[in-house]
């Protein structure tokens, strides 16, 4: 009697091999869900490095906006060295179209027993980062002008505080957006290690650039 063998789909084998690679080869926190979907659908099976790019377009369409960050996870582009720029130092931000300031304030007042961490800091801390960025961009766009300065009034902002909420656990960027919308936030910041930050109505910029999700710090 011939021994029976367990037939494992090629997509599953590829997924396993990708996930055991060193971290500098693939941003697992950012890409896991979408890469799994594309591999299961067998849309990223070809190998451009071997001269076969028959599936490249389909794979790119499947990964969508995550193509730039995740193409190395499916062997479509050269691996990146994420040790130089850890996921916690990168983030995606977006304004939410229909914020509900009163709801956000009500949910973040006082101590809560929910699975999130409320952080409040002066708005001027946001403005200092924002001014540095604007000044740098104006200098790049107008190199012929020297001593470019950005004038921002701090008189009113000094009394204002920016309140943000960090969810304890890691989540996808879609879940981050939905969760922040459901609590009335004005904006959200999703760190590329999957930490989610909801930004309150008093914040001028996009909240804090520091990861503070208690169960999602790496």
Curated annotation (Swiss-Prot):
InterPro entries linked to this entry: Tsg
One biological process term in Gene Ontology: regulation of BMP signaling pathway
Chief place of localization: secreted
Keywords associated with the record: Developmental protein, Glycoprotein, Secreted, Signal
Keyword Mitochondrion: no
Residues glycosylated per entry: 52, 81, 147
Coiled coil ranges: none
Pfam families attached to this UniProt entry: Tsg, Tsg_N
Cellular compartment(s): Secreted
GO cellular component: extracellular space
Stretch forming the signal peptide: 1-25
Family: Belongs to the twisted gastrulation protein family.
Record remark: domains: The N-terminal domain is sufficient to interact with bmp4.
Quaternary structure annotation from Swiss-Prot or TrEMBL: Binds directly to bmp2, bmp4 and bmp7 and can form a ternary complex with bmps and chordin, thus preventing the binding of bmps to their cell surface receptors.
More about this protein: Knockdown of tsg and bmp7 results in the siren phenotype with loss of posteroventral cell fates associated with decreased BMP activity.
Role, per record: Involved in dorsal-ventral patterning, permitting peak BMP signaling by antagonizing the residual anti-BMP activity of the cleavage products of chrd. Functions to promote the formation of ventral mesoderm by increasing the activity of bmp7 and other BMPS. Seems to antagonize BMP signaling by forming ternary complexes with chrd and BMPs, thereby preventing BMPs from binding to their receptors. In addition to the anti-BMP function, also has pro-BMP activity, partly mediated by cleavage and degradation of chrd, which releases BMPs from ternary complexes.
Official protein name in the record: Twisted gastrulation protein homolog 1-B
Lineage: Eukaryota, Metazoa, Chordata, Craniata, Vertebrata
